């Protein structure tokens, strides 16, 4: 889908994530034993569908890369509809925030001029006294922009939000009780101190995370009389990734942001999203996946932890409908997740896992990173500089990076230390 952009400037003066129970509980009845992983053969990312071997960077760039992307679009994530979208940026003037350490911007991005056009709110924090354009970490959040910090000026989302009594969220509506509940997962001050900006969008602004085909951005692009996505059309993860690319469109208009140095990141289902966004939108300089598991960085053929059948049963809207035909038939897939990582090549990618997060198969995430190595090396990078699964807390800083954090399915301050160290090494040379 082609996008054109219109910027509207308004001068404004100012007078979470919910842990998914079936992720945290490591559900019974699934394999968590490495000895029980079935034998499998991964598709070779350097062999075309017709059997032709890819032996040069030119072949990869001219033919195989597009072929792999089309396979993922056709059989897994779905394809964004053809056509053009005119994005409307309503830009709130930046204001001092976080005790003067940051500039806060809030931008409403509308997907067209029609009154019923959907819109998403982009929240941005930038170092207040930056002398040059700022590199940025961009990611989606689970429960609204207001949950990532206690900053009282962050807009409350008007979109549907999953009810969560622990966070004070009732009747699927955001309120003040949930302000800052996910702040631990968004180390804003840490990133600002290191010279980075942080930007986020509530995923539900783009497409609410439940199986109802007539809501969200997808329905806005239906053809006349269409009520559900067609067989190979985008699922929710692809819609979320589209939203991230639209945020990048905005960054290209903002002279405070270095749009050549944007890292796209995400956790869990939003880590699946960041990988897909980084794979298909080459404007992202760096891609970070945090505990993304099945449908993200973990190899489907291992059937370790969450499986294709389980994810399609629990979340039938995340992927295109064709992906469902591979329930219990992972070996018949023409793709696996090492090929998704390979689509990011030669740009750096970081796979961040957690030792206790067996549902997301941290070892399978590492093996997928290994499986992408040959593509990266063909394109002239160092690939993955690890022959075996690294010990916890050891950051592998090669172009394909890997880190295994002790602990559970989460995003922690330690994870942000790793993100920043990896970005310093590959994207900025040290942003400070």
Swiss-Prot record:
Q: Which GO terms describe its biological process?
A: polysaccharide catabolic process
Q: Which residues bind substrate?
A: 272, 359
**Temperature profile:** Optimum temperature is 35 degrees Celsius with p-nitrophenyl acetate as substrate. Above 35 degrees Celsius, activity significantly decreases, while 30% of the maximum activity is recorded at 10 degrees Celsius.
Q: List the disulfide bonds.
A: none
Motif GXSYXG catalytic site motif residues? 266-271
Task: Cite the pH-dependence comment.
Answer: Optimum pH is 8.0. Shows more than 60% of its maximum activity in the pH range of 7.0-9.5. 20% of the activity is retained at low pH range and at pH 10.5, while no catalytic activity is found at pH 5.0 or 10.5.
The regulatory note on its activity is: Is inhibited by PMSF and by NaF in vitro, which is consistent with the catalytic nucleophile being a serine.
This one is known as Carbohydrate esterase MZ0003
Q: What is the lineage of its organism?
A: Bacteria, environmental samples
